[in-house]
């Protein structure tokens, strides 16, 4: 498992948010496994705990909203960053 400074992790989460926003926008949702796979690739994580922590951070930062165990809604990224 790779460790990243907070600033670098924030940028990686923003990149994931922008990627999915450009794919589906606000009209459709993505699946939780799809988001977890993107986090796994971007952060180079293998363990589920670290992936789950990043999903929770994305919820805390209001980047995503989880409707159920599988539906994940992407919130619109800030344009000023």
Describe each model-derived feature in a short phrase.
Residues 1-22:
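Short alpha-helical segments that sit at the start of domains
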Residues 2-5, 26-29, 64:
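N-terminal regulatory modules in eukaryotic regulatory proteins
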């Amino acid at each position: 498992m790779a460790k990243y400074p907070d600033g670098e992790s924030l940028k990686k989460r923003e990149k994931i948010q922008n990627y999915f926003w450009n794919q589906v926008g606000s009209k459709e949702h993505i699946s939780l496994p799809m988001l977890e796979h993107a986090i796994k690739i971007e952060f180079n994580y293998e363990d589920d705990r670290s992936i789950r922590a990043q999903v929770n951070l994305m919820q805390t930062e209001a980047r995503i909203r989880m409707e159920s165990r599988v539906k994940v809604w992407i919130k619109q990224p800030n344009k000023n960053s």
